Amino acid sequence: MPSKFFLSFISLSALVLAGCGGSSSAPDLAVSDIAVNQLKYGQLSQFTLTGNFSDNEINVSTKNCKGLALVAGGTTTTKSVTCTIGAVGTGVVSLEAKLADGTVLKSVSFDVRNPQVSMQTSLGAVLLELNPTAAPLSTDNFLQYVNSKFYDNTLIHRVVTAGIFVAQGGWLTPTPAVQPGQKAAIALEVNKGLSNLKGTIAMARSADLNSATSQFYFNLADNVALDTSNGGYAVFGKVVSGAEVLDAMANVKTTTAFGLADFPASNVVVLSATQTK
């Protein structure tokens, strides 16, 4: 849904001009440019409006950018607002500045790419591309954990290569101990056009369909049965670089340790996970 924020810009230059003997009338209001510092899905972006701001009220509205707020400060020629990017696609995010009477001063649209996450592991680097269009709940949930650094220095604690072929993580530290900071569980997202094929990432959960929190798994082979088995498991992205790292995970030796079966005999560590796009 579009969001709106009303900005009352006071032009100090107009007051100065009048005091210096210049024209006492305010200069014509204009917005010559709207620039943005970053366009990462799910993250806060800052839009800077450049122009000539008088004491007229400006209506700034956005599409697919949530939580619009005015940045404190600014000058007589620049003002900034922030909001959180909420969609991906071509021209999907827009910002428009107009007068109270509806006169449009400037309208700009921006492209937003699918979010990507760089995951550094003890076996190498993996680059993930997520799909918020098909799986918004799972994508947003995963990115919240990524951006809070929850996954940094955690284990791939389960590698299964019989029946299903998965490498699961997002739960334990190398101690091992349960990583603190889990968020509320999310609803299951299945039948979204995504399948548990080799190289995809999906949410792990318990028998409760709506119990996924921080744990995820990589599909080390085609596991299409997981699309429907026990209600299905939600795929939300894929590996776009580093497939050899998943192959290396599939070849690790496992044991039973700490009450867990299929536990890697040597630690496989997620060193860091960072949203890059």
Descriptions of predicted regions:
Residues 20-277:
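Cyclophilin-like peptidyl-prolyl cis-trans isomerases
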Residues 11-14:
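Hydrophobic helical h-region of N-terminal Sec-dependent signal peptides
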Residues 1-9:
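Bacterial N-terminal signal peptides that target proteins for export
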